[in-house]
């Protein structure tokens, strides 16, 4: 979860992302969906920086 801070995302956005990650882990045991969810957000963050 430290990756989000290194990407330079706003603290509030990082907090919401971490909370969403915890909710996904609690409500959904499908690790593939969680992995896909984070890949999509990482790609968005990379486009935001570039």
Swiss-Prot record:
Q: Which domain of life is it from?
A: Eukaryota
GO CC aspect terms: mitochondrion
Give the location in the cell: Mitochondrion
Using the UniProt record, give the first listed, main subcellular location. mitochondrion
Q: Which UniProt keywords apply?
A: Mitochondrion
What name appears for this protein in its UniProt entry?
Putative uncharacterized protein Q0143, mitochondrial
* Taxonomic source organism: Saccharomyces cerevisiae (strain ATCC 204508 / S288c)
Its lineage opens with: Eukaryota, Fungi, Dikarya, Ascomycota, Saccharomycotina
